[in-house]
Design a protein with these regions (language model features):
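Short, hinge-like loop/turn segments at secondary-structure boundaries
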Residues: 47-49, 136-140, 218-220
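PAPS-dependent sulfotransferases, especially Golgi type II membrane carbohydrate sulfotransferases
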Residues: 1-5, 10, 22, 134, ...
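Short aromatic-enriched loop/helix-cap "lid" or pocket-rim segments at secondary-structure transitions
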Residues: 110, 131-136, 141-145, 213-215
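Conserved phosphate-donor/acceptor-positioning beta-strand/loop module used by diverse small-molecule
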Residues: 99-100, 110-135
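Short catalytic/ligand-binding loop motif for oxyanion handling, primarily in non-cytosolic enzymes
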Residues: 15-18, 104-107, 127-132, 208-212
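PAPS-dependent sulfotransferase catalytic core
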Residues: 1-80, 234-238
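Short His-Asn-centered micro-motif
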Residues: 7-8, 98-103, 123-124, 204
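Glycine-rich phosphate-binding loop used to anchor ATP phosphates in small-molecule kinases
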Residues: 76-107
């Protein structure tokens, strides 16, 4: 019996791998929403807020995650995760798993709870990722302390802020900063966590551009045949057709790690 989970920020194309696993007779729990997320999510959300209490914000764009790797995991946290995953963990299916983007926010303790399962780290170019809203855009909703978006804009990108003369443009710019901060934070928490025994990184763009080759990698990793789903090429590189800012320089480290081009 194998257990699989997906790590990746919301609006990162994670529904593609969830739908692929569902099409491949992997039980992903029930009920599911259109994105292939296991519902209801409330216990997972509470688990995110519980873990966030042990993350130390060091100011600016730095967090200390170190105690997450050594402190006792609170019983309340494990109870919440077992509540959320009850249908998956008790299912008799040979291959099963779950997907919800908020798993990324609790990744350090999920790895400690489930060290032997198979993890798929699903990444997407943040320039596309920050164009649309997701529940994790404002990390304060999950107990995470991070810089105020308008203060950050004023100090690091004053020209962008000054150019947003229309209220709607300014509001969208602020949300893109928050989404970029969310992407950056989630990259940081994953990067700071010792990786489990079974770990693979897959770029959404590679899945869209060459599904056959990407699935071959995943089939070798998971040890099961995978079904094909319909993908749309226009989901890659949307930032080229979008108005407004889609890049902030604090994204550079993560983008380089995953091989994304840095705009000049």
């Amino acid at each position: 019996m194998s257990l699989i989970t997906i790590v990746g920020r919301g609006h990162g194309g994670t529904r593609a791998i969830s739908h692929t696993l569902i099409a491949s007779n992997v039980y992903m729990g029930e009920p599911l929403n259109r994105s292939g997320d296991l519902l209801p999510p409330q216990a997972m959300y509470e688990a995110c807020r519980l873990l966030a209490r042990s993350v130390l914000w060091q100011g600016d764009l730095r967090w200390d995650f170190s105690q997450l790797h050594t402190m006792p995991i609170p019983t309340e946290f494990t109870d919440l995760i077992h509540t959320y995953l009850h249908k998956v963990l008790t299912a008799p299916d040979e291959h099963k798993g779950w997907k919800i983007p908020e798993t990324t926010l609790v990744f350090p303790w999920i790895v400690r709870m489930f060290p032997e399962i198979k993890y798929i780290h699903w990444v997407r170019n943040p320039r596309d990722n920050i164009l649309a809203r997701h529940l994790t855009d404002d990390l304060k909703d999950f107990g995470v302390t991070y810089p105020d978006a308008e203060t950050l804009l004023a100090s690091r990108y004053p020209a962008l802020l000054a150019a947003a003369t229309v209220a709607e443009d300014k509001e969208e710019l602020l949300w893109r900063v928050r989404r970029a901060l969310s992407w950056h934070y989630q990259h940081a928490i994953v990067a700071a966590t010792p990786k489990p025994a079974h770990w693979i990184v897959v770029r959404f763009e590679d899945f869209v551009r060459d599904q056959t080759a990407t699935l071959a990698r995943l089939e070798e990793y998971l040890g099961i045949p995978l079904g094909r789903i319909v993908v749309r090429s226009e989901t890659v590189g949307r930032y080229d057709r979008a108005e407004g800012a889609s890049y902030f320089d604090f994204l550079e480290e993560g983008m380089r790690e995953f091989g994304y081009a840095i705009p000049s």
